[in-house]
């Protein structure tokens, strides 16, 4: 009796196909109801990475790694240099800062006097040309004045850059001189002691 009630499941119309066999886009079973009609095969890449991708990866990883390592070393060196230079700057700042301020103020005074002199000379020139009756129109005069002022500003900016570089060089020279100068207090103490014993 048990054999008569058994259901034969072999008459189902499933046609299983491996995703690696057959043509592209075929379904896994009859009715073509897979994922997007392509089954598992449509979800898997068709081929591996190309040779150019592998080559660029093999070249890029060491280059990027070495650049990152170099950046880390430079950052560490900068921090160490700052830690060494900051106490020296604080130690010599009573000499460097007033000297830099004095030189900067003097150069600012020279530049200001030069600009005022150029402005005065251009004003006198304009007045003399006006009194002589030079037939210039107002826009030409304004253009001339603009060019003169632009030249004066460019000259002042160039001189300012040169003076800033000069001040920086002088400050570095003073710092190097103070660092290289020997500070031996023990010999002075022995000299004064020798003088007192000789007396």
Curated annotation (Swiss-Prot):
The keyword Iron does not apply. Residues 22-31 have a biased composition (Gly residues). Residues 2-56 are annotated as: Polar. Residues 1-31, 159-199 are annotated as: Disordered. InterPro entries: Oleosin (IPR000136). The keyword NAD does not apply. It is found in: Lipid droplet; Membrane. Belongs to the oleosin family. This is Oleosin 21.2 kDa. It comes from Arabidopsis thaliana (Mouse-ear cress). The lineage of its organism: Eukaryota, Viridiplantae, Streptophyta, Embryophyta, Tracheophyta.
């Amino acid at each position: 009796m048990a054999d008569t009630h058994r259901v034969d499941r072999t008459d189902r119309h499933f046609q299983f196909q491996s995703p690696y066999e057959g043509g592209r886009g075929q379904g896994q079973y009859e009715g073509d109801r897979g994922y997007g009609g392509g089954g598992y095969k449509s979800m898997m890449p068709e081929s591996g990475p190309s040779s150019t991708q592998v080559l660029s990866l093999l070249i890029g990883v060491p280059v990027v790694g070495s650049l990152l390592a170099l950046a880390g070393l430079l950052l560490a060196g900068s921090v160490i240099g700052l830690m060494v230079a900051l106490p020296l700057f604080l130690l010599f700042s009573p000499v460097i800062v007033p000297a830099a301020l004095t030189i900067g103020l003097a150069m600012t005074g020279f530049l200001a006097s030069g600009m005022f002199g150029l402005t005065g000379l251009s004003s006198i020139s304009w007045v003399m040309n006006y009194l002589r009756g030079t037939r210039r129109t107002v826009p030409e005069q304004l253009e001339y004045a603009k060019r003169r002022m632009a030249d004066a500003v460019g000259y002042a900016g160039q001189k300012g850059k040169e003076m800033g570089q000069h001040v920086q060089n002088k400050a570095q020279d003073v710092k190097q001189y103070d660092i290289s100068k020997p500070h031996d207090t023990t010999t002075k103490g022995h000299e004064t002691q020798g003088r007192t014993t000789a007396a």
